[in-house]
Amino acid sequence: MDRRLDPGLSPYRTFSRAEWAALRRDTPMTLRPDEITRLEGLGVHLSMQEVEEIYLPLSRLLSLYVAATQKLFRAMSYFLDSRDSEANGDGKMPYIIGVAGSVAVGKSTTARVLQALLARWPNTPKVDLVTTDGFLLPNAILEREGLMDKKGFPESYDLPLLLRFLTDIKAGRRPVRAPLYSHFFYDVMPDQYVEIDRPDILIVEGLNVLQTTRPPKDGKAIPFVSDFFDFSVYIDGDEDVIERWYVERFMRLRATAFKDPLSYFHRYSQLTEEQARATALSIWRGINLPNLMDNVLPTRQRADLILRKTGEHEVAEVSLRRL
C-alpha cells in the first residue's frame, strides 16, 4: 500500500536520498565505525553511508534549530526584563526532540544515532535519551484492567506521569526521574529510575508520542505530549515491510534473549521455527498492526520530519515540514 505524501497537497518539502545527502555540506563525520556498530538495533544494520547521507544532514539541521531556539529564548528573557525563573542556571531551556513510529521500525536506533551526533556539536554537549516504555502502566495494573493485549496502545500509559515529567524538564527542574522499563522482564521496574539532569537536548522516543485526543467542548486546555516537543521525527515504512522486520526481530530474540529462563518470553524459545513465525505474525496482526493503523500512523502528519524507510532499513526519502 503506497502511503507517500502527495507533493501537491503536502505541507512538507520532500527530498530524495541524494538531495538530502547534499545538505550535509561540510558537516564532519564525528563517529568511528565501531561507534556506529554499537548504535545498531536488533536486526537494524546501520552503515557509515547511512549516517553520512541521512543522519549527518539531520544533525546539522537540528543544530541550527537548537541554536535558533536558544537565541529566541534569550530574546524572550530580555523582553521580560528578567531571567526566566523556569530556565536552567545557564539560561538555557532544554530542547526536546520526539521520535515516533511503529514497533520494529527502528525508532531506538534513530534516537541513539541522533543522541551520539548531537552530543558532538559544541552548543549541545549534553544529550539525554528516554523512552516512553518506562511510562507504561505496570503489568499488574494492565492485567487488572484487562489491558495486557493493549500494551503499547495509548490507554496503557501513565499519561499524567509522562506529562509531569516533561513539564519538569521544560521548567528546568533538576534532577528529573523517569521510570525504568525492562524488555527482558516486559515490565516497569519497581523503584528503579533514570535521572535526567539539565540536558541541552532531551530525545523522547516512543510509539505514541505524537498522539492527541479530541479537545473538550468547553475549550479547557488539555496538554499533549507533543506540546512539549521543539522538533519531532516520524519513522515511516510500509506495513508489510514493518511486519517482516517484526517477525525477523522476534525470531532473533527467540534464539537469544528468550532462551534465558528468567525472560518473560522464555516460553517462545521452546517453539519450533514454524510455530514461532506463526506466533510472531499473530502478535503483529492482532496487536501491533491495529495499534499502528489506529493510533500511530494517524500521527505521522504531526511530525516535523518524516524518514521513509525501504525494506533494508535504509532511508529512501525525507519529508521536512515547511516553515
Swiss-Prot record:
MF terms (GO), sorted A to Z: ATP binding; pantothenate kinase activity
Keyword Ligase: no
Record GO biological process: coenzyme A biosynthetic process
Major place of residence: cytoplasm
Pfam families: PRK
Chain sites annotated for binding ATP: 101-108
Subcellular location as annotated: Cytoplasm
InterPro entries in alphabetical order: P-loop_NTPase, PanK, PRK/URK
Annotated pathway: Cofactor biosynthesis; coenzyme A biosynthesis; CoA from (R)-pantothenate: step 1/5
Catalysed reactions, semicolon-separated: (R)-pantothenate + ATP = (R)-4'-phosphopantothenate + ADP + H(+)
Record key words, sorted: ATP-binding, Coenzyme A biosynthesis, Cytoplasm, Kinase, Nucleotide-binding, Transferase
One Gene Ontology cellular component: cytoplasm
Record CDD domains: PanK
EC numbers: 2.7.1.33
Entry-linked HAMAP family: Pantothen_kinase_1 (MF_00215)
Family statement drawn from the similarity comment of this UniProt entry: Belongs to the prokaryotic pantothenate kinase family.
Protein's name in the database: Pantothenate kinase
Species of origin: Xanthobacter autotrophicus (strain ATCC BAA-1158 / Py2)
Gene name in the database record: coaA
